[in-house]
UniProtKB/Swiss-Prot annotation:
It is found in: Cytoplasm. Its cofactor is pyridoxal 5'-phosphate. Homodimer. PANTHER family: GLUTAMATE-1-SEMIALDEHYDE 2,1-AMINOMUTASE (PTHR43713), GLUTAMATE-1-SEMIALDEHYDE 2,1-AMINOMUTASE 1, CHLOROPLASTIC-RELATED (PTHR43713:SF3). The lineage of its organism: Bacteria, Bacillati, Bacillota, Clostridia, Eubacteriales. Gene3D superfamilies: Aspartate Aminotransferase, domain 1, Type I PLP-dependent aspartate aminotransferase-like (Major domain). Pfam families: Aminotran_3. GO terms for biological process: protoporphyrinogen IX biosynthetic process. InterPro entries: 4pyrrol_synth_GluAld_NH2Trfase, Aminotrans_3, Aminotrans_3_PPA_site, PyrdxlP-dep_Trfase, PyrdxlP-dep_Trfase_major, PyrdxlP-dep_Trfase_small. It comes from Acetivibrio thermocellus (strain ATCC 27405 / DSM 1237 / JCM 9322 / NBRC 103400 / NCIMB 10682 / NRRL B-4536 / VPI 7372). Belongs to the class-III pyridoxal-phosphate-dependent aminotransferase family. HemL subfamily. Its main location: cytoplasm. This is Glutamate-1-semialdehyde 2,1-aminomutase.
Amino acid sequence: MTLSKSKLLFERAKKVIPGGVNSPVRAFGAVGGYPPFIKKAKGARIYDADGNEYIDYVGSWGPMILGHSHPRVLEAVSKTMVDGLSFGAATELEVQMAELITELVPSVEMVRMVNSGTEAVMSAIRVARGYTKREKIIKFAGCYHGHADSMLVKVGSGAMTNGIPNSGGVTAGAAKDTLIARYNDIDSVKLLFEQNKGNIAAVIVEPVAANMGVVPPKDNFLEELRKLCDKEEALLIFDEVITGFRLAIGGAQQYFGVNADLVTYGKIIGGGMPVGAYGGRREIMECVAPVGDVYQAGTLSGNPIAMSAGIATLRELYENPGIFENINRLGQRLSEGLGKITKYTVKAVGSLVCVFMTEEEVNDYDSAVKSDTGLFGRYFNHLLNNGIYIAPSQFEAMFVSNAHTDKDIDETLEKVSLFFARKSPPA
């Protein structure tokens, strides 16, 4: 497999873009080599500048649940764009999107559109503080909630990949009101409530911790969080940027049967376009300006092109509930197949799958970081060279889409088995 054009593009990019990329993990620093520059995508396949074809399990990091270039989404975007790209004013499309989300997710009575998951989380936290008149937020080690200053503490995703648990430029003041608990450990949360009595505004959690690999919640963990937040009169925020409209049409709340007070969304709700949203109970959301005193705004929020792509995606999912059955079945086939091939730990929830390069059980940040990242790098490059594109990080999920087929799963497992069949995977 040649990457000559991608190499040239990467060298050009490094002269004008920090690290040559617009998101750190894309630089392949954790796995080595040159990142392929992608030219086009269709269904479950992506194609790079050199003409190489890959079965894609990144899916733009989650949004492409229907597969790339889905006809319904492309048609919706094409019809909308001829009327204009952005107005900076209210449109019917943003009303339709909000109505659709509130219909599909009963716990969300009102919703506000933004442009990214980071914006959604940043805004939801501000709303939680404004509503409760409290300052402190509990998050979990290894969970990633975007790159707002107050959330860049013990994070997952790219920062975890690069060995940066915090970030330069984040002041002690910005992070002082963020408290860290241990994922899947309700006692660690109770202790923080005891130590900060009456001053915790909210607990924010990824219902499935999908930015330190894929770490499912233990039995009753989410239920216990719900009970504890009710008892302490704090809000429970579900970060469903990844799980929203993926695990089920109602997201993780429907999948696990636990409702949050506020929910953040991104990825799938944009159908591939830059979109985020946050929503929740009416009484909480009415704290947001111009109704309330919690200020949040955005020039491109509710962009009509993004709304049309998102509406088309959500309607396709709603009108075809068999999609969830199919992607969850494929996810199970993939995870069970991986589990038979390798001695290492495989975790999955629905269409989210991860192989941890450790033989220990993985339930939290501390156990996830025991993974052999060097081995993962060799595994990644073996798959890449054999036409299988997964995230260039041990601590990210494989995303199965409705465009994947059983044949794709079989081919993927065959390529994986070739790697692990070697007594000593190459250095």
